[in-house]
Amino acid sequence: TKHKIISEIAEKTGLLVQTGGGIRNMETLERVLASGVKRAILGTGAVKDKSFTCRAIEKYNDAIVIGIDAREGMVAVDGWTKSSNNYAVDFAVEMEKIGARTIIYTDISRDGMLKGTELSVLEEMVAKTGMDIIASGGVADFTHVLEAKKSGAAGIIIGKAIYEGKVDLKKCLQNV
């Protein structure tokens, strides 16, 4: 199962693992956290069930990260298949009010495209909240990492660019 694989990764590597996807109730959240992950990412669950999100943050504090996946600034849900009526920055502010401390902001129109991170929404989110905002989506080279850092991002998620050898992770970790 997914949870068994995640548990093995956390146990065998000693890495601090975070995971998301399908966490929409306390039972699933507790199973995920029991598998050895450091942080659980609430995405659609946070958008669709504020009561669940409040309970999760109240009980697990910093182990909860809010994943805001957005297309053209609007929050997407259900595996990116539907857009909501929530503007990403407004939703981040709302999540901060209920106690969230960390956001992973993904511009899904750029995820895996290697075209750089869309900075305007990221910068606005950083400016309007006191949370740690982690940027995700579009990183193609070290310049994009520096741009995200300059915009105020607390961190950045790099995927495809590492797999394809376009970004040297060691260089990023040493220089940012």
Walk through the language-model features, giving the residues of each.
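C-terminal helical cap(s) of enzyme catalytic domains, especially alpha/beta-barrels
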Residues: 52-59, 64, 149-176
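Glycine- and other small-residue-rich loops at beta-strand/loop junctions that grip anionic moieties
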Residues: 21-22, 42-45, 106, 111-114, ...
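Catalytic cores of alpha/beta
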Residues: 13, 17-39, 120-155, 172
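Alpha-helix-loop-beta-strand connector modules within alpha/beta enzyme cores
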Residues: 1-18, 54-69, 114-141, 176
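Short active-site-adjacent structural elements
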Residues: 112-114, 142-145, 164-167
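Conserved anion-binding
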Residues: 30-33, 37-111
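Structural motif corresponding to alpha-helix initiation and N-cap regions
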Residues: 3, 26, 47-50, 85-89, ...
